């Protein structure tokens, strides 16, 4: 009897070692997964805004994604949060507000009311909400453009524009751990980068973890490394717009009305 118990104990220990080894192998494969740039197309717009269409590939997961990104200087450009109570399309709003580029904004409830903090032209229409999903705030202050944690928000500085969304994707140029890596969807994102630059854009079907890895590793320019980034409303809400120098525009329309937009204007 004692021998049987000993054999069972030994088998359990052996099984545990096997499971541990498998887990480490899976982790190692995941850790080796890297997104690499397959192709890049770029175009300069007004006020130094640069549009890029970037195709990236994760050979380990056998997955490709396409990003449409606008990169701009926080010295020459500023953010605006544009209210959209009538459900207007992004293109019409961007043209009317004379924006250089823009994307859809934050989350909203079934009654079309914004969820979380929203400040437009220094006027606040909703307050900071503490929730697991909306952990980030994009803001424009007199000091420039920033992406901060919701817990870091303070009214001590004058905020010109702000929008709360999330989750956080990149911090200190590293992807956030624990993000969902299985649910693929269109994504909209914003970020701040080195050399006082900022970026906003959309990405084709990718998980939150995948997008975080892309933003933290893919070089959009030789001297442009993403320091912080957060997710905006995505899926059917995702939309992107860029004003070309010749007066035309490149546009990826959303599939449903959204409550607000994030636009970029020249200072």
Residue ranges of model-derived segments:
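Bacterial N-terminal signal peptides
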Residues: 19-28
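Zymogen propeptides
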Residues: 32-129
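A short, polar/proline- and glycine-enriched secondary-structure boundary/capping micro-motif
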Residues: 90-92, 156-161, 188-189, 209-214
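Conserved, well-ordered active-site substructure
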Residues: 112-132, 180-188, 192-231, 236-267
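Flexible, D/E/H-enriched segments
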Residues: 33-60, 175, 244-267
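Bacterial N-terminal signal peptides that target proteins for export
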Residues: 5-19
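Active-site-adjacent helix-turn-beta-strand microarchitecture at beta-sheet edges
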Residues: 108-181
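Short acidic-glycine loop/turn motifs at beta-strand connectors
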Residues: 73-75, 139-144, 171-172, 192-196, ...
